[in-house]
């Protein structure tokens, strides 16, 4: 069934997505007759950041529309770019036109932009919620907890939409506590690399660089104050059932901050739930940071909402206890590749176990190639 669905998707998307058609011609693939036929057609993250940086630097938003259209199933010429000032306004206009584009974190200095249709967004949110519930089956969202999350209410990261529907289901009235309401903006992730380019070409001067650095310092100071206030709230609520949703790097930061305040390991309500994600994002952590975090909050595996996913996926692969395995949704076709990412190594059905680079094809994707 998966192979047949992939075959149908390819035949449909090849007519809609210019880059896919070009890739298929270069690879000599005319139909999907085996999973191996998908491999040369897979898009890497670099495809979604293949726009010339000059488009963003020079405010050439019509060109960004055209670029996005080469990777999208639906026409993007309906995105109104009149008076757009920066990348975040372009993303807002795209969403208003039915293109729910989300940005990567842009740690390399150049963000990826992946298109989602409204159907993609709605189905993905439902799938993510189902996976979250599947990983903690003994607990039901009942608006009874003090909820703490690092995710702001607005921004360009895909997980913001998910957190906006996940956490309110658990929060008691008045007990939904965000680290900050400051939006997560693509512009700020891209700005340092952009300034370096513009400085090299003489388009900005030292004064603009100094102003940017002062802005960053002020924001860091504000963030530190927000974090301290957030810790005050967490300490005051620790005797209640909690739901704490953070990335591992922030979780470790919480552990350090509260230990410095004299909070002991396990000094939290025994029914506390947690969810983690995103890795440590370069934070300096000890090798046993996961064990220390769990011990500090006193949580056990069955009280952790856990999954495996990439932002490109529709939904998550829920972690199943007590087997410590992941439930792959039926619309995700896992493909285990060799190190160069060019050859399919086989399937679990063939050998029982396959080890290699993880790739996947998402049958559910509507707004782009899966």
Listing of model-derived features with the role each one plays in the protein:
Residues 106-108, 278:
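Short, histidine-centered active-site or binding-site loop motifs used for metal coordination
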